[in-house]
């Protein structure tokens, strides 16, 4: 949507909610039936198409047909698929899994709208023109896990040539974005699309960003309105405007490292944050002090001094199925 604005665990768990330890848990899962962690683990959990039919696709036509229904299904993507087209609508109870690093969607993105229980994993999505929508858009939907994806465009064009990479809008809820490589883009990840949408969004937009590598981003890394965010174990490299909390959002920011940022963590229109063990790399935390000190799920922290080695080279489309 367009608006003016293998080391880390896929299932990091088992630690006390109030006092996660600064250790690395190497528990990365690689099976098609893995369940999500973070906010996507709540509200009944996110299992995607586990237990359903399995198919492998390698063409645009086969892909669009395979992901559309709400029946349980696991759809493997084999090789690159290139098509200039609007976002492909994804049905509920779906797992979309790239078989390896060649599984890249180019020119079109994915839309999860009014759906639930969706997993998008080990997939590349790149160079989706603004007229075709976001690379990954999540609207009016709950329980979505985006894991080990590589999303990008370029910064050779102006900021409106492409739209968002991963955008959550219209009361999307219980979402986890983990182990992703998010790079080479102007406006990366928007949570809450408008200052005027508080009536719909307040009480929703709960999202976890964990173990991600953000690189060469101008802004929205991420930008959160109204919702509740948890950003941890992530490495931010040459991200001009980083985490922007706004319009009453509450964000817990832990165990991250920033290099080359001008605004690492900041508020707009009364957004709030609590930060713990972050290396802002010379930039400042100017966010208003928040109240979100714990989250209702287990997780572990690697520590800001270890984030780069833990995330770079591991985040992104690095799995094989």
UniProtKB/Swiss-Prot annotation:
Q: What is its main location?
A: secreted
Give the active-site positions: 220
**GO terms of molecular function:** metal ion binding; pectate lyase activity
Q: Which family does it belong to?
A: Belongs to the polysaccharide lyase 1 family.
Cellular component, GO, one term = extracellular region
Return the EC number: 4.2.2.2
The lineage's top-level taxon is: Eukaryota
Identification of the protein by name: Probable pectate lyase A
| Note on cofactor | Binds 1 Ca(2+) ion per subunit.
Cofactor(s) needed, names only, are:
Ca(2+)
Q: Where in the cell is it found?
A: Secreted
Which keywords accompany this UniProt record? Answer: Calcium, Carbohydrate metabolism, Cell wall biogenesis/degradation, Glycoprotein, Lyase, Metal-binding, Polysaccharide degradation, Secreted, Signal
Q: Which reaction does it catalyse?
A: Eliminative cleavage of (1->4)-alpha-D-galacturonan to give oligosaccharides with 4-deoxy-alpha-D-galact-4-enuronosyl groups at their non-reducing ends
Q: What does this protein do?
A: Pectinolytic enzyme consist of four classes of enzymes: pectin lyase, polygalacturonase, pectin methylesterase and rhamnogalacturonase. Among pectinolytic enzymes, pectin lyase is the most important in depolymerization of pectin, since it cleaves internal glycosidic bonds of highly methylated pectins. Favors pectate, the anion, over pectin, the methyl ester.
Provide the residues annotated with a glycan attachment (glycosylation): 93, 238
Listed binding positions for Ca(2+) are: 134, 163, 167
Source organism per entry reads Neosartorya fischeri (strain ATCC 1020 / DSM 3700 / CBS 544.65 / FGSC A1164 / JCM 1740 / NRRL 181 / WB 181) (Aspergillus fischerianus)
The region annotated as signal peptide is 1-18
Q: Which InterPro entries match?
A: Pec_lyase, Pectin_lyas_fold, Pectin_lyase_fold/virulence, PEL
Gene assigned in the entry: plyA
Query: Which GO biological process categories is it annotated with?
Result: cell wall organization; pectin catabolic process
